[in-house]
């Protein structure tokens, strides 16, 4: 299987905010931030690493650092990754619900723009 580079974009809410960027900038652990950014660089090169499907078009990247950080994303075809939000193991269920809500909103706006 050939590795395909992916374009990574952030989900932007209708109010202009980016839940993923807000979460990442709120992290105080600079080591974790660095590991997350490095992981996203590997994703952009086509290496998703440790991830799983959560259903309804949403996926979870697992980061082996700190309290078990998670990045939630959606994919369009196999080339575009949309970062929805992030969290850790303690807020996982709430974060998954938000990610599904954000993905539905993103997808609806995408369909309506065409």
Q: Which ranges hold each PLM region?
A:
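Basic, Lys/Arg-enriched alpha-helical interface segments
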Residues: 1-67, 77-81, 88-114
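Short, surface-exposed beta-strand/loop micro-motifs that present aromatic residues
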Residues: 70-74
């Amino acid at each position: 299987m050939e590795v395909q580079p992916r374009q990574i974009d952030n989900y932007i809410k209708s109010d202009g905010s980016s839940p993923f960027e807000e979460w990442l900038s709120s992290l105080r652990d600079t080591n974790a931030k660095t590991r997350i950014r490095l992981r996203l660089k590997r994703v952009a090169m086509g290496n998703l690493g440790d991830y799983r499907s959560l259903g309804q078009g949403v996926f979870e990247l697992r980061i082996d650092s700190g309290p078990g950080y998670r990045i939630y994303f959606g994919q369009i075809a196999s080339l575009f990754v949309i970062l929805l939000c992030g969290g850790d193991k303690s807020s996982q269920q709430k974060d998954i619900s938000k990610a599904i809500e954000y993905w539905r909103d993103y997808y609806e706006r995408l369909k309506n723009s065409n």
